[in-house]
A protein has these predicted regions:
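Transmembrane helix-bundle signature of multi-pass secondary active exporters and lipid flippases
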Residues: 50, 54-62, 236-240, 244, ...
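Hydrophobic alpha-helical transmembrane segments
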Residues: 128, 158-209, 379-383, 397-420
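Helix-loop junctions and terminal segments of transmembrane helices
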Residues: 64-81, 149, 270-295, 301, ...
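Membrane-interface junctions at transmembrane-helix termini in multi-pass inner-membrane proteins
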Residues: 75, 137-159, 349-376
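Signature of the first transmembrane helix
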Residues: 11-69, 73, 133, 228-258, ...
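Interhelical loop/hinge segments that connect adjacent transmembrane helices in multipass membrane
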Residues: 1-13, 121-122, 178-191, 200-244, ...
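Interfacial segments at transmembrane-helix termini and the short loops linking adjacent helices
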Residues: 9, 14, 46, 112-130, ...
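Membrane-water interface segments that mark the loop-to-transmembrane alpha-helix transition
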Residues: 16-27, 53, 62-112, 125-126, ...
Length: 432
């Protein structure tokens, strides 16, 4: 088993996935750096506003571009990433995104005008600013996936994990010097205009050098096909984003921005586990797809067993560390964030239990069970909404954590059960 894992690591270094993982971990470190700078220089309500808008961009941005950052590689990869395919798909996706962007802006404009949303003026202002910039946010995400299709993976991941935070870092530097710290959220929002323009320039320059020849079998995808393929993926992606964002939306509604900040800090600490699970999942993704297509279920069992052990042992090590040093970790962000210590402990235990389910997400995705995955996550979102409505008003931060844990356990273990019934493969971690 370990020789196979060693082989996977060597292959990962050779095909740049090691460097991709390095950049993704760098992205997590940047998230912690921005959180540290926020929590040590701004009031908790400002930190909460930042985390609320960050979640808003994730969910609404994915909706208006129909999760093209997830689907674009499929749409152009079918024709070997040929030049004319990239141009055609890129133009169609930008058109769809722009139409939905305008529609989204008008809907919120009408809703706020007639007071359909019961939010304060600060939140309303933040949402409308974000709606104005959403198109640029989507352009940036679409651009970096095109860069990946052009085989500039390193450039793509650098934009995703490092350059994305540059406007915010400039904001920290300039505003603290000028004494206008209350403008920091604007740097985050409007920074996506700069990133969209910069990524577009880089994409244009690199695309000029791209010479992959015309594919004689190429047939232009119509808008109907793009919608038909993208909608199920959008359901899965938005549902997944909602699972990590609904708690924040409800905490903001019931308790305000400061509670969003307290919860988000704990949630970001636990995000290290998610990064590790995703990295392990990516390292075996192609092997899962290949062996499933061949019908080699013995090989599949070996892959899921080895990845399940890696996921569990990493989760256990990290969770134990967090449980022992939870107070020390939270105090780094400021004494007021110690209020979320019990929340951090709950999330750690919950994620450790979830890690027993192994690599459920990637297995379903790579074995042609994407629709099942989408339905599972969507059901988990509904459960999460109901639990949040019941638990958050009474238990605040702990209620949000419990809701999140139950939802995650639901879709992971139900997914593992479905895999066992369908493929006769036990994807759960086993000690032997």
């Amino acid at each position: 088993m370990y020789s196979k894992l060693k082989k996977l690591l060597v292959e990962g270094i050779n095909n740049n996935s090691f460097f991709t993982l390095f950049l993704r971990l760098s992205g997590v470190l940047f998230i912690f750096l921005t959180t540290f700078l926020f929590t040590n220089n701004y009031e908790a309500d400002v930190v909460g506003q930042y985390d609320f808008i960050r979640s808003y961009f994730l969910v609404i941005g994915s909706l208006i571009m129909l999760s093209s950052d997830q689907t674009i590689l499929f749409l152009i990869g079918r024709y070997n990433n040929a030049r004319q395919t990239i141009i055609d798909v890129y133009i169609k996706i930008l058109f769809i995104t722009f139409v939905l962007y305008v529609l989204n802006y008008l809907i919120f404009l009408i809703f706020f005008y007639f007071d359909f949303f019961l939010v304060n003026k600060i939140t309303e202002s933040l949402i409308m600013k974000s709606n104005l910039v959403l198109f640029f946010y989507c352009i940036y995400l679409i651009n970096i996936e095109i860069l990946r299709a052009l085989e500039y993976t390193f450039v793509s991941e650098t934009f995703r994990n490092i350059i994305k935070y540059l406007p915010l870092m400039v904001g920290f530097l300039c505003l603290n010097t000028l004494g206008k710290s209350n403008e920091i959220i604007n740097f985050f929002i409007y920074g996506f205009i700069f990133i969209a323009i910069f990524s577009s320039i880089i994409l244009f320059l690199l695309f000029k050098k791209y010479n992959k020849t015309y594919d004689s079998h190429y047939k232009k995808d119509n808008f109907k096909f793009i919608f038909k393929y993208s909608l199920p993926v959008t359901l899965s992606t938005v549902s997944l984003y909602l699972l990590s964002s609904i708690d924040i939306f409800f905490l903001k509604y019931f308790f305000g921005d400061n509670y969003v900040a307290y919860y988000s800090v704990a949630f970001k600490i636990i995000s290290f586990i998610s990064v590790a699970i995703n990295a392990i999942g990516l390292s075996v993704a192609t092997a899962l797809a290949y062996n499933y297509k061949k019908g080699d279920f013995d090989a599949l069992k070996k892959i899921v067993n080895s990845s399940a052990k890696l996921i569990f042992y990493f989760s256990m090590t990290f969770s134990v560390f967090v449980l022992i040093f939870s107070e020390l970790i939270l105090s780094v962000f400021g004494k007021e964030y110690l209020i979320s210590q019990e929340t951090l402990v709950l999330l750690s235990i919950g994620n450790l239990i979830a890690s027993f389910a192994g690599n459920t997400y990637m297995y379903l995705l790579m074995t042609n069970k994407g629709k099942v995955l989408g339905k599972l996550i969507f059901a988990a979102v509904i459960i999460n909404i109901v639990l949040n409505l019941v638990l958050i008003p009474s238990f605040s931060l702990k209620g949000a954590a419990i809701s999140s844990i139950i939802s995650i356990l639901f879709w992971n273990y139900l997914g593992a059960y479905f895999i066992y019934k369908q493929d006769k493969i036990n994807i759960l971690f086993k000690f032997k």
